[in-house]
Amino acid sequence: MADDKKSVKKEKKVKKKEKKIVPRGKVYITASFNNTIVTITDMAGNTISWSTSGAMGFRGSKKSTPYAAQIAAGNAAEKAMDSAGLQEVDVMVSGPGIGRESAIRSLVARGLNIKMIKDVTPLPHNGCRPRKRRRV
C-alpha cells in the first residue's frame, strides 16, 4: 500500500516566460559617491534589467569611477535590448556621483535612442538638518 503512493509522482509543468516586446522605456541612473546603479524599466515602471558597478566586478574606490558606470550602463542596456527589444528611452539621473555623464554616453553607444534626460536629484527646501560637514 505504501509502495503505491511512492511510485506515483506528479509531473510539474514549467511555463516558459513570454518575451515581452517593449519598444520604449525609462532608465534610472543613481550615481552616489560610492557606486552607480542603472535600472531599466518599461513605461509603467516594471523592471526589465538592472546593473551596478559592484555587480560588474569593481570593488572599493573603483566602483565610483566613470569607467565602472559606463560598463554597468552598457551591460544593463544590452540585457534590455536582448530580452525586451528596447529601442528608445527616457533617462532619469539622480545623485552627485561622477558616473552620471559616462553612463548616459554608454547608453547612446549601445544604440539606444534617448528622447529625454531629466535630473531628478532630490533637493530639500530647507527640510531636515543635514549631517555635520566632513573635515579632511
Swiss-Prot record:
Pfam families: Ribosomal_S11. One of its GO terms (molecular function) is rRNA binding. The keyword Ligase does not apply. Disulfide bonds: none annotated. One of its GO terms (biological process) is translation. InterPro entries: Ribosomal_uS11 (IPR001971), Ribosomal_uS11_bac-type (IPR019981), Ribosomal_uS11_CS (IPR018102), Ribosomal_uS11_sf (IPR036967). The keyword Ribosomal protein applies. GO terms for cellular component: ribonucleoprotein complex; ribosome. Keywords: Ribonucleoprotein, Ribosomal protein, RNA-binding, rRNA-binding. Located on the platform of the 30S subunit, it bridges several disparate RNA helices of the 16S rRNA. Forms part of the Shine-Dalgarno cleft in the 70S ribosome. Belongs to the universal ribosomal protein uS11 family. Part of the 30S ribosomal subunit. Interacts with proteins S7 and S18. Binds to IF-3. This is Small ribosomal subunit protein uS11. It comes from Leptospira borgpetersenii serovar Hardjo-bovis (strain JB197). The gene is rpsK.
